[in-house]
Amino acid sequence: KYDFHRRSFEKISNFTTPRRYRKPVRASSGSPGATWFNIGDGAVRIPASSGSGRRRVPNANIANFMTKLSVNINKIAVVRNSRGGNLPDVVRAALDIERFGAEGITVHPRPDARHIRYEDVRNLKRVLATEFNIEGNPIPSFVDLVLEVVPTQVTLVPDAHDAITSNAGWDTLANRGFLTEVTARFHEKGIRVSVFVDPDPAMVAGAKACGADRVELYTEAYAREYPAGAEAALAPYLAAAEEARRQGLGLNAGHDLNLENLRFFVSRIPWTDEVSIGHALICDALYYGLENTVQLYKRELR
């Protein structure tokens, strides 16, 4: 398969088979006082021995951890809705995306049904085998839909009905009562609750106080500022992510993440559980093909 991103050919035998990690094997190193071990498809540098005279081999569980990719399929529904009918078929596309290796499917139904419709959500629930994430503003009709469908995860997003896309996270302090109440309703059905927040440790702590299981960091500012300076762009997200870890919250991230900025984000915040990516991935798929694009994004998460 031709990888347009790296301009090279790559042999891929089976997209659905997870990576197998070999037993760590000592590899040569040009750096004195250090040893490299081949683990899976890469190498890990082990510092020089401590006073005990022993080198620590990386924990296999840490080596095997990889941030999950949940693909937002809203843009596929936009194309379908532009002509009427059912082409492309969002359910078939979601099943293919699963087959190509994504660990989850995300949808964001809005009241105006401009892309994903409530009936799409019901149809997807019947067939998906991976994690199903429904995100949106918890208005009464949305809450009723989520309680009916019972997805793996619901992500609460404070978007206005006329917003083109999500543009801010919750003020979890000002909305604590409301978020606590709706979170409890979802928990009664066994649904994991993630709260969409800006990269502010106070908002992360507020989400914990509301009973959330995870937070999703709104990464638009990171993506916008990344070209001017990656470290500066990441700094507030690192602080928020560390607060999530202190609070015992799971960590998701999403909005404008792409092939250029994704690897740096997860390499600096490796405890990110999941990234939700839609717009950029579907745009890339126009050039690279959907199957190849899913694999390209998964490779950035390794």
Across the structure, where does each feature detected by a protein language model lie?
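Hydrophobic faces of well-ordered beta-strands that scaffold small-molecule active sites
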Residues: T67-I73, I105-V107, F132-I134, V154-L156, ...
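Glycine-rich phosphate-binding active-site loops on the catalytic face of alpha/beta enzymes
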Residues: L156-A163, R214-Y226, T272-L290
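Alpha-helix-loop-beta-strand connector modules within alpha/beta enzyme cores
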Residues: R114-P140, N175-S194, A232-N252, Y297-E300
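Catalytic cores of alpha/beta
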Residues: P140-E148, D200-A209, L257-T272
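Histidine/lysine/aspartate-rich catalytic loop segments that bind and position anionic ligands
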Residues: R192-A244
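C-terminal helical cap(s) of enzyme catalytic domains, especially alpha/beta-barrels
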Residues: A168, G229, D284-R302
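Active-site mouth loops of central-metabolism enzymes
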Residues: N72-V90, N133-P138, T165-L173, I191-D198, ...
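Conserved N-terminal beta1-alpha1 strand-loop-helix module at the mouth
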Residues: A63-E135, I139-S141, L147-P151
